[in-house]
Amino acid sequence: MRVSKYLLSTQKETPANAEVISHQLMLRAGMIRRNASGLYSYLPSGLRVLRKVEAIVREEMNKAGAIEILMPMVQPADLWVETGRWDKFGPELLRFKDRHNRDFVLGPTHEEVITDLIRKEVSSYKQLPLNLYQIQTKFRDEVRPRFGVMRSREFLMKDAYSFHLDMDTLNETYEAMYQAYSNILSRMGLAFRPVLADTGSIGGSMSHEFHVLAQSGEDLIAYSTGSDYAANIEKAESPMPTETRGAATKELRLVDTPNAKTIAELVEQFGLDITKTVKTLIVKGATEEAPLVALIVRGDHELNEIKADKLDLVASPLEFAPEALIRDAIGAGPGSLGPVGLNMPIIIDHSVSVMSDFAAGANVDDKHYFGINWERDLPLAQAADIRNVVEGEPTPDGLGTYAMARGIEVGHIFQLGTNYSKSMNATVLDENGKSQVLLMGCYGVGVSRIVAAAIEQNFDDRGIVWPEAIAPFSVGILPMNMHKSHRVTDIAEQLYKDLSAAGIDVLLDDRKERPGVMFADMELIGIPHTVVIGDRNIDAGVFEYKNRRTGEKQDVPFDQIVDFLKNLQA
């Protein structure tokens, strides 16, 4: 490709409304342009990257035995009513009526459509297992789209769905998809971690997320220093306390604490050990008999809302009680709450169950109890794992301790079980002629999200540093003063032909531009390899080669340059 015949829309200035580096660089490098909130057009360079990501995804899915199909983005509402998600999904589901007043949605996901398709097409166990995938545009009406294509309303996704008669074949397909996803991200040259994950709104049992590691990642990953164990912070298991509860050594005291509204203020003003304090959080209950529930964690720990949401006594989705409701029920506000004398179900974290002589709110404004002890001052409450893990704690496999990293979720695989097939009556006849509800798996990759995540992991102060496999072009040719030197023009043109003939994606900058502008554009758009041609190089019979990632330069003889560049891509 020649720059003179290409839409290379680079920008010097960083757009003011771009928050994260991938959004900034995709705009500056001329990869995307915003059409509306959360909606983007892909310009040529952006589309080239997107298509390369898509090609790798497709190749690995095909290798894993999945079969490609294509389903409509527009879906009939009656399928969503059938599974109950018409009411459950919320405003992210964009709904509309056609000219015949029939309800439709723009698909954020395709479980309903694929299950409907399979229940009509598959009738015998002999047709199973079956793994179908598509690469299709999705739409979620995010309340606040942000971060460019990282969290846009319209996005490109690969979603696969597998169908099984037994858990053995579901497990086999799940493992195949796990490996395929690992292969996809490895081939793209990205540092990543698969992690245990919560199944979220899609539901199911087993679930893993695939995270591209980046300091800007929204997700916190807890992983073991001594094994492959890794989990999203929402899913990471807290260790059970190894110590036993100590004997009471202090009397229960009611203390005035007028200026201590937070744990930090309480600890600072009274010289307390933060591990001897607790936080009490009031949430909505799941039953009329218990409309409010108290959740208690140690003062230095944080409540894990995903874990709390799964408690039987707690309403789902988790909802914190408003202050007015808390005051009406307890007589005190947040900052002064505690377990002593609290007339509602109490669930404590396991770490709280072994505490003694601890401090908590007294359920009276501006007062706390010091020296609280279980069984002496109140009954020991129900205990559960309801907190986030902490760095340095032992991991569940016993092979290391927790360390933390930030990641960007780009893939998610689920074992759905019968969540959708049962509600939609997707069944087949087994070998005995009996009707069996299909088991399902679901496997998603954010194709457009990978593009942004790759940039978040691969950039410097000059622009994008693309991994070889997904760069828009592999090689950039920079002829110095091309329009003033016939020698430079002739050699640049010949090199362009030779590299193109060798199957290398090459961009020839044939503009009448200053060298500084040409170099800046090549570095901004992130081309991995640059070849500079000038009269001095020609006199010496060499090209000047520069590596975008390392910055290293070297001279390469004319007759060796094609093989040299091909070897770099091998």
Swiss-Prot record:
Q: Name one Pfam family in it.
A: tRNA-synt_2b
- Can you quote a single GO CC term? cytosol
Q: Quote the PROSITE patterns the UniProt record gives.
A: AA_TRNA_LIGASE_II
The UniProt catalytic activity note for this protein reads: tRNA(Pro) + L-proline + ATP = L-prolyl-tRNA(Pro) + AMP + diphosphate
Annotated compartments: Cytoplasm
- Identify the EC number(s): 6.1.1.15
Q: Which GO terms describe its molecular function?
A: aminoacyl-tRNA deacylase activity; ATP binding; proline-tRNA ligase activity
Q: What class of enzyme is it?
A: ligase
Which InterPro entries does the record match to this protein? aa-tRNA-synt_IIb, aa-tRNA-synth_II, aa-tRNA-synth_II/BPL/LPL, Anticodon-bd, Anticodon-bd_dom_sf, Pro-tRNA-ligase_IIa, Pro-tRNA-synth_IIa_bac-type, Pro-tRNA-Synthase_IIa_type1
Query: Keyword annotations for this protein?
Result: Aminoacyl-tRNA synthetase, ATP-binding, Cytoplasm, Ligase, Nucleotide-binding, Protein biosynthesis
Q: What role does it play?
A: Catalyzes the attachment of proline to tRNA(Pro) in a two-step reaction: proline is first activated by ATP to form Pro-AMP and then transferred to the acceptor end of tRNA(Pro). As ProRS can inadvertently accommodate and process non-cognate amino acids such as alanine and cysteine, to avoid such errors it has two additional distinct editing activities against alanine. One activity is designated as 'pretransfer' editing and involves the tRNA(Pro)-independent hydrolysis of activated Ala-AMP.
Q: What is known of its domains?
A: Consists of three domains: the N-terminal catalytic domain, the editing domain and the C-terminal anticodon-binding domain.
Q: Which family does it belong to?
A: Belongs to the class-II aminoacyl-tRNA synthetase family. ProS type 1 subfamily.
Q: What is this protein called?
A: Proline--tRNA ligase
Protein's organism: Shewanella oneidensis (strain ATCC 700550 / JCM 31522 / CIP 106686 / LMG 19005 / NCIMB 14063 / MR-1)
